C-alpha cells in the first residue's frame, strides 16, 4: 500500500457499520457517488474485496471483517497522535473522550466526570453529547473511549461492554389540572385515551420499541404527537402547554424535579426499570479507560445506585 488515507478508513468504517451506502453517505455528509469511489480506491489499495454488493444490499467479506477491526484501531491511534501535541502544550498527559446522551442524561454522569478530573487532573476529558445511536457508533468506531448511556441501545457487532450504574423508574408526565393528575397512580389503559408526546423513533429505536411494549403492549397509541426535541426538558414543555401526556425517568425513591405546569404520577402496575451505565469497546486501548470505569463504579456505590461487588 503506497500510503495510508485515514479518510478512506473512516469511510469504510461508516459503510461497514451501516451496511448501506446511502445511510453511510448521509452520516458522513458526503455524496454517495463519492463515497463509492473512495471505497473502490481503498479496495484497490489493499488488493482485496472488502464489501460484497448485491441486490440484497451490502455485506462485509471475510477480508472486510478483519480489516474493519484493524481500521478502527488505526483511526483511534491516529486521532490520539494528532491530539498529543495539543495536550502536551496544555500540560496534559492524555485525553479521554467521553460520550453522554442528550436524550436523558443520567444524573450520575456529571459526578463521575468530576470525580475522574479530581483524581487525574493531568488527563483532559473531552465530552461529546450525542443521541444514543451516535454514541454506540462512536464506541464501535473508536471515535469515543467510553460513553454514559441509557439502555437499551442498538446492537452492533461486536457488542460493547456494559456496566450498569443504576436505574430509572418510569413516571407519567401530566399537564397540571388534567383529569389524570387527580389520580395517585395512572392505569396503563388510560394512556391509550390521551395524546402521547414522544420524540422520533430514529433517535433510539430499541428504547422507543421497549417503552411502547411496556406501556401499550402490542397496541399502538391511537393519538401521538411526535416532537423533534430530543431533550426530556423540552418534551415536557409540550406537556406543560397541555398538548398531551408524556413519559419521564426518575431515580428510585426520588421525586422528579418540579416543572411548572407538569405533575408526575407513577403507573398503577409495576414496570421494569430502565438501566443506565457506561459502555466501551472490548478492544479499546485508552490507558485511562479502566480508571474511568472504576471511578464510575465507586460513585454509583457511594450514591447507593449500585451494590458493592
Regions found by a protein language model. Name each.
Residues 161-170, 174-196, 281, 290:
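Flexible hinge/capping segments at coil-to-helix
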Residues 107, 184-188, 194-219, 250, ...:
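Secondary-structure junction motif
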Residues 93-155:
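Central regulatory/effector-binding core of bacterial HTH transcription factors
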Residues 131-144, 150, 200-263:
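Hydrophobic hinge/microswitch elements
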Residues 43-60, 65:
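A short LG(V/I)-centered, amphipathic sequence patch enriched
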Residues 156-163, 168, 233-283:
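Beta-alpha-beta core module
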Residues 1-38, 54, 67:
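N-terminal short secondary-structure element
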Residues 108, 262-306:
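A late-sequence structural motif
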Amino acid at each position: 500500500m503506497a500510503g495510508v488515507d485515514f479518510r478512506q478508513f473512516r469511510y469504510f468504517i461508516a459503510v461497514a457499520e451501516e451496511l448501506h451506502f446511502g445511510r453511510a453517505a448521509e452520516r458522513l455528509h458526503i455524496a454517495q457517488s463519492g463515497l463509492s469511489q473512495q471505497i473502490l480506491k481503498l479496495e484497490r489499495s489493499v488488493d482485496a474485496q472488502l464489501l460484497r454488493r448485491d441486490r440484497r444490499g451490502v455485506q462485509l467479506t471475510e477480508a472486510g471483517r478483519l480489516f474493519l477491526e484493524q481500521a478502527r484501531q488505526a483511526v483511534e491511534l491516529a486521532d490520539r497522535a494528532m491530539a498529543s501535541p495539543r495536550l502536551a502544550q496544555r500540560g496534559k498527559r492524555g485525553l479521554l473522550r467521553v460520550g453522554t446522551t442528550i436524550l436523558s442524561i443520567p444524573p450520575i454522569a456529571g459526578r463521575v466526570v468530576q470525580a475522574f478530573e479530581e483524581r487525574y487532573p493531568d488527563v483532559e476529558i473531552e465530552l461529546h453529547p450525542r443521541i444514543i445511536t451516535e454514541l454506540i457508533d462512536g464506541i464501535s468506531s473508536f471515535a469515543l473511549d467510553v460513553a454514559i448511556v441509557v439502555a437499551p441501545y442498538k446492537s452492533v457487532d461486536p457488542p460493547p461492554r456494559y456496566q450498569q450504574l443504576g436505574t430509572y423508574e418510569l413516571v407519567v408526565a401530566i399537564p397540571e389540572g388534567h383529569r389524570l393528575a387527580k389520580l395517585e397512580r395512572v392505569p396503563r389503559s388510560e394512556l391509550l385515551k390521551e395524546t402521547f408526546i414522544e420524540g422520533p423513533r430514529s433517535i433510539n429505536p430499541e428504547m422507543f420499541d421497549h417503552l411502547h411494549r411496556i406501556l401499550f403492549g402490542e397496541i399502538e397509541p391511537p393519538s401521538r404527537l411526535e416532537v423533534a426535541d430530543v431533550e426530556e426538558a423540552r418534551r415536557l414543555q409540550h406537556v406543560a402547554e397541555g398538548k398531551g401526556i408524556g413519559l419521564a425517568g426518575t431515580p428510585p425513591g426520588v421525586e422528579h424535579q418540579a416543572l411548572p405546569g407538569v405533575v408526575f404520577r407513577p403507573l398503577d402496575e409495576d414496570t421494569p426499570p430502565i438501566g443506565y451505565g457506561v459502555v466501551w469497546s472490548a478492544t479499546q486501548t485508552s490507558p485511562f479507560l479502566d480508571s474511568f470505569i472504576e471511578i464510575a463504579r465507586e460513585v454509583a456505590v457511594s450514591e447507593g445506585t449500585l451494590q458493592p461487588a
